C-alpha cells in the first residue's frame, strides 16, 4: 500500500526491523501503509490503529491483524497497564510539521505540537518496548533524551533525508526477525547466501548426523 512517509524504502524497513527484539505482541498506533508490519515476521498478536477511516478501510480483511479505527494515543493510554515486556510498540506518527519541507500537510489526520507532546508523555509511561520514528526535532530530542537513538538515511519525495529512530531499550542481543540482518544490501546478501549454503550443506548430511548437528546447535 503506497502511503506518504511510508517505511518501505530500501534500507529503511530493514534498519527498523533489525532493531526489534523478540516480542509476542506488536502494535502500530499509526498504521498508515503498515510497511513494517507487512515486512516483519508476525508476532502472536498484531494490532494496527489509525485515526483515518480511509486507512483502516483499506486494511479490512487483513489476516492476522486486529485493525482498529481510532486514536492511537488514546489506545496506548488505555492499554498501558496491559502492555508488558513481551510487547513492542512501533510508532510512526505524522512527523512534526515544522520539521517537514515547507510544512506540507500530507495526511487526513495530522498532529499538532500539543498532540505530539501528549504522545511522548504516554510513551514514557509504557512498560513495554517502544520504537519511535521521526525527523529530528527539539521536542522529541528533549523528551526522549534518555532513550537510545540511531540515525539512518531515507529517500523522500524531496531526496535523501536523515531520519531518527528512538528506542527505550538497549541494543538487542536477539532479534525477532533475522531475515534482514546486515547494515546494507551487500552485507544482507552475503549473510543470506551464506545461510543458504549452510542449509544446503546440512540438508545433504545423513539423517542421524544432521540431527546430531542440529541438536548440538540448539543447546
Question: Language-model features: where?
Answer:
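Class I S-adenosyl-L-methionine-dependent methyltransferase catalytic core
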Residues: 1-219
Amino acid at each position: 500500500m503506497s502511503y506518504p512517509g511510508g517505511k518501505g524504502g530500501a534500507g529503511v524497513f530493514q534498519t527498523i526491523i533489525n532493531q526489534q527484539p523478540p516480542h509476542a505482541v506488536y502494535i502500530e498506533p499509526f498504521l498508515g501503509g503498515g510497511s513494517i508490519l507487512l515486512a516483519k515476521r508476525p508476532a502472536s498478536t498484531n494490532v494496527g490503529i489509525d485515526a483515518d477511516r480511509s486507512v483502516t478501510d483499506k486494511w479490512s480483511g487483513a489476516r492476522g491483524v486486529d485493525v482498529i479505527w481510532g486514536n492511537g494515543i488514546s489506545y496506548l493510554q488505555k492499554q498501558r497497564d496491559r502492555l508488558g515486556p513481551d510487547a513492542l510498540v512501533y510508532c510512526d506518527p505524522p512527523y512534526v510539521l515544522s520539521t517537514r519541507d515547507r510544512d506540507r500537510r500530507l495526511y487526513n489526520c495530522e498532529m499538532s505540537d500539543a498532540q505530539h507532546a501528549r504522545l511522548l508523555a504516554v510513551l514514557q509511561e509504557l512498560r513495554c518496548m517502544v520504537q519511535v520514528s521521526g525527523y529530528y526535532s527539539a521536542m522529541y530530542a528533549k523528551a526522549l533524551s534518555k532513550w537510545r537513538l540511531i540515525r539512518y538515511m531515507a529517500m523522500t519525495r524531496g531526496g535523501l533525508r536523515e531520519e531518527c529512530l528512538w528506542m527505550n531499550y538497549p541494543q538487542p542481543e536477539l532479534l525477532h526477525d533475522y531475515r534482514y540482518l546486515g547494515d546494507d544490501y551487500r552485507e544482507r546478501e552475503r549473510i543470506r547466501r551464506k545461510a543458504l549454503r549452510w542449509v544446503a550443506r546440512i540438508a545433504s548430511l545423513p539423517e542421524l548426523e544432521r540431527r546430531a548437528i542440529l541438536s548440538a546447535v540448539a543447546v
